[in-house]
């Protein structure tokens, strides 16, 4: 390889790196402040000292619009803490996904207050590469157990999207 070809290749690589670093610097993060409400139903099965719970429902929130949600969690019955995963699905097929950690407390017979902190790990469509955190703060009505329980609450937090 002659010196001229080597110089040309190095110059091309340097130009590519400059373009890539410039485009990354031009990308900006758009933060969406989310405030909304939701209603849903949950079911679960007790296994040993845990409750394997699944929930789903629908809601509407600022900056993201109407959504449906699915939550799968393992609840430690000794301390009412939970861990799991969630999906928020939008009418056009876009998705936000992530993990959750929660804590519940009984507020009355057949009722509980549950707060779940959601960590956004990504998404699809307009939420591709999304990060951030959301909070499900809900009241659960267990008067229809063992068939299911009803819940309603608020969704708050921030979604960060790279544009």
Task: List each model region and its residues.
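Bacterial N-terminal signal peptides that target proteins for export
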Residues: 2-13
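Beta-strand-enriched cores of mature, soluble protein domains
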Residues: 26-163
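Bacterial N-terminal signal peptides
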Residues: 12-22
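General helical secondary-structure elements
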Residues: 5-6, 24-26
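Compositionally biased, intrinsically disordered low-complexity regions used as flexible
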Residues: 1-2, 110
